[in-house]
């Protein structure tokens, strides 16, 4: 254990995903030895993210504006929604060049052990986009502070692109059951080729491209 600000820095770094105590210590000592201007740039970047990044009011993706670049793109199919867990998953799918619809970011996956239920995700916002009822008993108290949409295009298909692990599969199954209430809506899941137990973030572009092209109805 170190004393004072150094230990405080190590403790804060250890709270970051994927950063253990040893890695946090290495980062802290690295920061002690870098040029002060580098520290200032890091502080500025963190402040800019805190103050300048928000969530798109339509799809809940990260954005600098009220509506993100993808939702503002008139060349995309507004009736096709790909549901992902996190904003980083959008970047992976975009790199394939296969998908020309819009997205919806859940903000995670259902995980009872971590106390993540429907109320902690943007499921009610997704239903709102499709035209669902917002006073569903399971979701009535779950809505993040997302304004009502100004427009409601006719949604014809929802692709469930949650991670192919236990939590992602449970989330996809839950959403598929909810979306059965919309008889004209096609609900599909990414096709085979996705590794079970993995994260979408680490799937290569070719595998993901084939999965998108060969998606199957649920």
Swiss-Prot record:
Keywords: DNA damage, DNA recombination, DNA repair, Metal-binding, Zinc, Zinc-finger. Gene3D superfamilies: 3.40.1360.10, 6.10.250.240, RecR Domain 1 (1.10.8.420). GO terms for molecular function: DNA binding; zinc ion binding. SUPFAM superfamilies: Recombination protein RecR. Coiled coil: none annotated. GO terms for biological process: DNA recombination; DNA repair. Pfam families: RecR_C, RecR_HhH, RecR_ZnF, Toprim_4. The keyword Nucleus does not apply. Residues 79-195 form the Toprim domain. InterPro entries: DNA_Rcmb_RecR, Hlx-hairpin-Hlx_DNA-bd_motif, Rcmb_RecR, Rcmb_RecR_Znf, TOPRIM_dom, TOPRIM_RecR. A zinc finger (C4-type) spans 56-71. Belongs to the RecR family. May play a role in DNA repair. It seems to be involved in an RecBC-independent recombinational process of DNA repair. It may act with RecF and RecO. HAMAP family: RecR. This is Recombination protein RecR. It comes from Corynebacterium efficiens (strain DSM 44549 / YS-314 / AJ 12310 / JCM 11189 / NBRC 100395).
């Amino acid at each position: 254990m170190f004393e004072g600000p150094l230990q405080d820095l190590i403790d804060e770094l250890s709270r970051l995903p994927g950063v253990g105590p040893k890695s946090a210590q290495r980062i802290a000592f690295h920061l002690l030895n870098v040029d002060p201007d580098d520290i200032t740039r890091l502080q500025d970047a963190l402040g800019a993210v805190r103050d300048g990044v928000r969530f798109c009011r339509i799809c809940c993706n990260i954005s600098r504006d009220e509506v993100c670049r993808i939702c503002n793109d008139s060349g995309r199919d507004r009736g096709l929604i790909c549901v992902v867990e996190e904003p980083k998953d959008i970047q992976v799918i975009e790199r394939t060049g296969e998908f020309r619809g819009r997205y919806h970011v859940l903000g995670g996956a259902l995980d009872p052990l971590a106390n993540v239920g429907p109320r902690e995700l943007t499921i009610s916002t997704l239903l709102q986009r499709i035209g669902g009822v917002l006073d569903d008993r399971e979701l009535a108290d779950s809505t993040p502070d997302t304004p009502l949409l100004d427009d409601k295009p006719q949604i014809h298909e929802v692709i469930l692109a949650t991670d192919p692990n236990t939590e992602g599969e449970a989330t996809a199954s839950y959403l598929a059951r909810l979306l059965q209430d919309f008889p004209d809506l096609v609900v599909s899941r990414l096709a085979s080729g996705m590794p079970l137990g993995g994260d979408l973030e680490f799937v290569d572009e070719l595998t993901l491209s084939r999965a998108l092209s060969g998606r199957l109805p649920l």
